[in-house]
Regions:
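H-loop/switch region of ABC-family ATPase nucleotide-binding domains
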Residues: 222-224
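Helical segment within the ABC ATPase nucleotide-binding domain
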Residues: 201-215
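Hydrophobic anchor residue at the start of the ABC signature
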Residues: 176
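Conserved beta-strand
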Residues: 25-28, 37-58, 86
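ABC ATPase nucleotide-binding domain signature region
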Residues: 59, 74-139
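Conserved beta-strand-loop-alpha-helix hinge in the C-terminal portion
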Residues: 243-273
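The feature captures the beta-strand-to-loop junction immediately N-terminal to the Walker
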Residues: 63-65
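Walker B catalytic motif
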Residues: 191-192
Length: 338
């Protein structure tokens, strides 16, 4: 029996190409529609030509500056925004059209604060009902009691907390607990740990890693907080201007930079900021503005080198392209393998 458990856990090691496909994004393009339900004339896509595939056991860290498109991508994956059915598949089904994914808990999205709409006012307020944490958590039906008890312990929840008196961090713990009660297969996290203290956050990340390694779940986690994340993700996705800039296993990212993960991402964002400043200057001077990062780069193969020597957001100082990475004709599409 013990040997069977070991084989089961190892079968969900992150990065295995033979693991089941959990998330597949193919040439995703998205623009928020106008009041007529159509994209405004002349509008540029907010998300454009975005493709990646995640397998069972993958833990993907989604990074990028404010406004890069991270939340929009997660909402599309969570079935909250409609795109063509074949653009986004969760376990082979359309994230938006197959409502059974979310109703069953197989696909779970956690992001933002608990809020409710104010009728006719056009805005929302945080949920602060006079109700206990126990009633909220135990009010979710169809839950494995052992899983519920483990989550209460991991998140250090006091069941006597009253939601109208609880702190932001305490309410956040209850929100996360309720979102994880059902055994998800794909979990989308949008800056969900922002209110948690260091201890609870560390215990939660450990629990989520176990979910991937033991049950074969896949997680995409967007955050700007890097405490405890140095070795947590299996893959890094860097997004800028709604486009995929980099998608690599964590070991490959570490090979490209000798800095910490946080400092590496900081370098990408600083270079992106500098590129944005240069574009604005060129535009103000009446010069042409480069549209994309890698399209005009003569550098091929290694994605890190493309980001380095091309006119690109996310340049890494630790990589330099050699003569073997150049080609006579321009390479417009770059395929990044796992």
């Amino acid at each position: 029996m013990e040997e069977e458990v070991v084989r089961s856990e190892s079968s969900f090691a992150a990065g295995r190409a033979d693991a089941p496909v959990m998330v597949q994004i193919r040439n995703l393009q998205f623009t928020y529609p106008g009041i007529d339900g159509r994209s405004p004339p002349g509008s540029r896509p907010l998300i454009d030509d975005f493709s990646l595939t995640l397998h069972a056991g993958d833990r993907c860290l989604l990074v990028g500056s404010n406004g890069a498109g991270k939340t929009t991508i997660l909402k599309i994956l969570g079935g909250k925004l409609m795109v063509d059915p074949d653009m986004v598949l969760i376990m082979g089904s359309s994230a938006f059209h197959d409502t059974g994914l979310t109703s069953s808990g197989v696909l779970s999205y956690l992001g933002g604060e608990w809020k409710r709409d104010i009728a006719f006012a056009g805005f929302e307020v945080s949920i602060q009902m006079d109700i206990s944490a126990e009633k909220m958590i135990y009010g979710v039906s169809g839950v494995d009691p052992r899983r519920r008890d483990e989550l209460i312990k991991v998140l250090d929840i006091d069941l006597s907390w009253r939601m109208h008196k609880a702190s932001d961090g305490q309410r956040r713990r209850v929100q996360i607990c309720m979102g994880l009660l059902r055994s998800f297969k794909v979990l989308l996290l949008d800056e969900i740990t922002v209110d948690l203290d260091v201890l609870v956050r560390a215990d939660l990340l450990k629990y989520l890693r176990k979910e991937c390694e033991e049950r074969g779940a896949a997680i995409i986690y967007a955050t700007h907080i890097f405490d405890g994340l140095e070795d947590w993700p299996s893959h890094i996705v860097y997004v800028a201007h709604g486009k995929l800039q980099l998608f690599l296993p964590l070991p490959k990212v570490k090979e490209m930079s000798n800095l910490s993960l946080m400092r590496t991402v900081e370098c990408w964002l600083r270079k992106e900021k500098e590129d944005r400043r240069i574009r604005q200057q060129r535009k103000g001077s009446g010069l042409s503005v480069f549209e994309t990062a890698a399209d005009d780069s003569p550098v091929i193969e290694a994605p890190g080198r493309i980001l380095n020597n091309g006119w690109a957001a996310g340049r890494l100082h630790s990589t330099v392209a050699g003569p073997n990475n150049y080609k006579g004709t321009l390479m417009y599409k770059v395929k990044i393998s796992r």
